[in-house]
Amino acid sequence: MVLRVLSRSCKLTTALAFGTVGATLYAAEAAPTHPAHSVKHAAPLGSAPVRHRNAGHATSRTATDAETIKVTTRKLPTRFNTEQHVGSSTTMISAETLQQRAVITTTDIQKLAPNLQIETQYGSSALNFHLRGVGFNDLTMNNTPSVMPYIDGVAYPISSMTSGPLFDIDSIGVDPGPSGFTHGQTTTGGEVRITTKAPEKQFHAGIAEDFASYNRSKTDAFVTGSITHNLQYRLAAELLEGGGYYTNRDTGQSLGDQHTGAIRGKLAWQPDEQTDVNLTGYWSLNRSEAPGFRINNNLSAFAGHYGRDLGYYQTGWDIKPAFAKLIGYHDTKPQFNDLNWGFHLAMAHRFRFGQLDISSAYDAVQLHEYQDQDGMPYATADDYRTQVANSFTQEVSFHNLKDSTSRFSWDAGLYYNRIMQKQNNYYDFSDYALRGYMSETRFSSPQETFNQYVTLGYKVLKNLRFVGSISHESDSRQLVDLTTIHFGHNDLNFGTHGALANQFTGKVGIEYQATPTSLFYADIRKGMKPGGFTANNTVVAQQAQPIKPETILAYEIGTKNDFFAHRLRLNAAAFYYDYRDQQVLGNIVVPSYGSVGSYVSVPRSTIWGVEGSMEAHPTRDLTLTQVVGYQRGVYDQFHSINAAQVNAYYAKTGIWQAFYSNYHGVDSGIPKISMNGSAVYTIHVLPHYHVLFDVDYSYRGAEGLIPGNPPYRTVPAYFLLNSFLTFEPNSRKWSATVYATNLADRKYDLTRSQATNVQTAISGPPRFIGGRLNYNF
């Protein structure tokens, strides 16, 4: 550190230098790559700290306007150092890691965090998030998730709204456990927070092109800069094409090509030094081919023609002219036609005693998806779904301006969300003997959620802090005019149903900063998720009844540590969940019809586990990471359909009959082990150029998807190995990369399901070998 102070007192100089560095340590760690700079005319000592848009720059306060202090920050090996002083088990993922680990879609995030699963809903574009065994398989896309996805601070409570491309990302935070105490909506499972890149004052642009196996191409571009001295912009776009690896077993046609495009625009305005206004608009279109369903076991009358698929990427499809006419479908392959768009407005004003944040968001989705769920050219389970939905969110929050010396902290806010949606779900059962018709289930579903929250923190000692939170959420939703039409047979009208939830949740916690780089914490949290409805192929009144809200009482202890000047990071956590009225996807057996999906509540269950992460920099050129998660879940009180026994009886007799089992003490099917790790080595080949070489892996344990964990609905464990080699200048202005994902070409499944009496799976991607060029200017 170099100090040049126009002061007569050397003692004052020393005090200023060390006092400033100590006060700004967290900020300097948060963005270690910022260059040294000088600050003149600093605020007087004792003035309120101000949160600036570029809050990672080291700043200094001086005694007189004549003084100048020059501060040089040291680049630390680790990232996200500020988060190391927060009592939570959040996993932070940087933009660089996302690119290096070839994260193409949102589902790829699960390869980087412990005890996290992100899966498509039986091959649709809608996503289901599970964290520490808590999650919800939203078969009907009309219920609130247990794990809430956020993009730039805006909650997405409809699963189909998270289907857009993942591009121009700044960071991702995976935060397990009940949430909703400082922002947003109450959850039982946690949050996945995606933050996109913000506008910059200096002009900056870039383009990246990625080519890979199966004719997959991915193009990303952005441009950012200033319009005026206090108005900045950023425009980013992505185009993803190809990559289909499924093959029609009869015709040899390929299936699964991606055809997606998206654009996002941002404006950042600072009308004065204490106010920030940010406007975001986005648009994305998905006209991709649907994934293929591989037959695992065929109990239908066509088993002689289409038995178990031996080729791992085999599938089949067809669409009958009558069904195509009914739904107005003109393509020959199963395909999506989804449109997502929205606007977000966020305003922040800093007072001397606190910051006021106001945000408004409007998001909309128009979804049209056709899938051949039986994987055959016969019409036993051909599905076409349409959804038109919009979400309006308004949030007002107020918090004090905290810094490392603050003894008291507080956050308070109000959150409101209103959703309107309409759905039509068509099925073609023409070739299924027990039905032999086409059907449509339609409904509309308005819902409102209102959450109020307060969080208080107090340092009883310099290094000991207590935290307390309370929130109250009310939720009202309806299922309006639920109707199922069996064309040529009958109409079933189930009327209108409602569900209410009105509960308090909260948190108490303690944080102990044992050393400047070692934190210990413990907390108890209660979370709540509203109830909801089954609204997919509804044939009996029981399906239309609402499920109860679920609650969790969560206990967690953890520690965060940096050793050897931040060259070794070790974080660990242990948790225990007391789960009440857990919402799971079960079955109802309807005689002379078959087994149909329906949400059921598990009165009592428990989940417990441990997590650990390591980041090591043994040398300047070597980085090692390792993440491990272990979890167990059991049903303590649960009596439900035994799906395996139902199917076995049908296979033997051709009759659908309900059989029930007591699942007390039975494993709930969550993946017990999840791991990922990487080794990245930098080779300095020339004075101004280097090569990055990486080997990384991910492992996920077996996952049972329905109670009892029958094999046909259990996704086996899998291990994936990846690698990349990047050549770039030290300035990182451009880079050239070759990479491989699933290097060992492992055969694995993304999900397993059953459509009428055909048990199917969706195969995971095979080995992809690709190259990526990136240029910034």
List each language-model region with its residue ranges.
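Periplasmic-side early beta-strands and strand-to-turn transitions of outer-membrane beta-barrels
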Residues: 200-202, 210, 221-319, 324, ...
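Gram-negative outer-membrane beta-barrel transporters
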Residues: 399, 576-578, 600-706, 774-776
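Membrane-embedded beta-barrel scaffold of Gram-negative outer-membrane proteins
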Residues: 346-351, 355-371, 513, 519-527, ...
